[in-house]
């Protein structure tokens, strides 16, 4: 008679493959259940984003500017004029609150088009404390000079966001700034008047970016630059700003920053000999709406 113990073992051996398969299926099912991410049904409300996928941004800002202007206009390259500090010598304002407006279009995920306007208009009347030679005119000590110096910049900028994540973005930009300059100096008792006006397009290359520290706090920076090195003219233009923003909701934010705008031109051209060194810089307060 067969061993009774062997008869007891045989059924267990027969069941072993089935038990092993069942255990493997259970383990696989548990792993599948563990790895599957939880998803919301289509009808469930989605959480609101911190930043909307906007197509239009309107920014209004106030710049507390501290202008610094130095210039010299020569009668000829061999007869230099007098170097003038426009704030000290002519009495132009050395601080001014400047409102500015920017409109940014975002036609796609990586493209931006910005329209901007920047203007600073100043005028003053002062009795001169030194003789000044400006172009081919001489202004004498004690004479009252009424002066005007206005600068308006209209900007059109295209940007491409080559890095774009949920937390940060970096864009390369190319812009055209239309500079409109008006200067005027008048001595009324001698009927002496010297005025210059000019409009010029200025191409600028730039880079800008944003980084989100949290759902509400971000830092952003922007810089545009142009340099010219020709036979008779050397110059550069810099427009840069740095800011920190606080987002009240996905559609509205407030920011505090600093902006500097610099023009530095040195000319040895026979018709326009001289130099201009203009800096407009100061703290910036702005509000931006997204639509």
Predicted regions and their residues:
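Bacterial N-terminal signal peptides
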Residues: 8-18
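Short glycine/proline- and aromatic-enriched beta-strand/turn motifs that initiate or cap beta-hairpins
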Residues: 23-120, 282-290
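Residues that define the transmembrane beta-barrel architecture of outer-membrane proteins
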Residues: 54-56, 95-99, 150-154, 168, ...
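Transmembrane beta-strands of outer-membrane beta-barrel proteins
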Residues: 59-63, 114-118, 173-177, 222-224, ...
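Residues on the lipid-exposed face of transmembrane beta-strands in outer-membrane beta-barrel proteins
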Residues: 60-62, 101-105, 156-160, 174-176, ...
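Extracellular/periplasm-exposed beta-strand and loop segments of Gram-negative cell-envelope proteins
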Residues: 68-96, 119-151, 178-199, 228-232, ...
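Repeated loop/turn-to-beta-strand initiation elements of outer-membrane beta-barrel proteins
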Residues: 110-113, 166-168, 215-219, 250-254
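Outer-membrane beta-barrel transmembrane domain signature
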Residues: 177-250, 261-264, 291
